């Protein structure tokens, strides 16, 4: 037997418990990222566009490549439904997410779609906010979410790798999207870019958005060896060169770092990119009070 719960825009079928030993394949069938609560607010409703998805590669350097998932408004008549094979937080256990995008769908035409980059936490992966990515694409945005090398569930390297590379990765994704040709390149408008960063993604967004690091950041016990983090110091030529006029707004969600002396008042005062910050009152990792 099963219980059928009808929401505003979806039907959720809840299987009656039959066994305490369900396989992960069975459990995965319920991992839907496109369900809406009956009381979902207006901005959470599905947009007017069907959604396509594709996978690309962005080059940060000759030795650093990022796998990037890209969601986009698709052509009218696109049939919804795709799955995303991914891993749980342990980096070993496979799972599958089910959404409403269509893999390699024809691209919508007739308008320009602003770009939004979604940057995951440490660890995480490009599917961490895939529910948000599908929703934004349905509203008319192109959304690019990278796997940050050295910072994913299956590739979790020293924390300093993330401290150094996160804002560099974020800019590289914009560069890769701007270099696209063909229908998707015609659709995406990289002169208007928003950046959503979760936790360490928010740390990167703060730096990329204008808040250069304080000298105390170089003394953090998990900072990369050799002083390479100095390239992000407030007032440095390298941090100034990182700034990007294409970046129009940032949305850090629980950004890590301010409670770890990564910034000071002078560095934060350099932030001139429009910012909308989200934080949780019981966040004891990024530290709500510090945010």
PLM features per residue range, with description:
Residues 271, 277-279:
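Short beta-strand/loop motif that positions the catalytic acidic residue
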Residues 120, 197-199:
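Conserved alpha/beta-hydrolase "nucleophile elbow" surrounding the catalytic nucleophile
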Residues 14, 19-116, 289:
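Domain-level recognition of soluble alpha/beta enzyme cores
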Residues 192-194, 251:
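Residue in the alpha/beta-hydrolase core beta-strand immediately N-terminal to the catalytic nucleophile
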Residues 264-265, 273, 286-291:
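Short alpha-helix in the alpha/beta-hydrolase fold that links the catalytic acid
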Residues 200, 256-257, 281-284:
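Acidic beta-to-alpha connecting loop that harbors the catalytic carboxylate
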Residues 98, 103-113, 118-155, 260, ...:
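Short substrate-entry loop that stabilizes the transition state in hydrolases
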Residues 128, 158-191, 203-209, 217-236:
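Alpha/beta-hydrolase active-site loop
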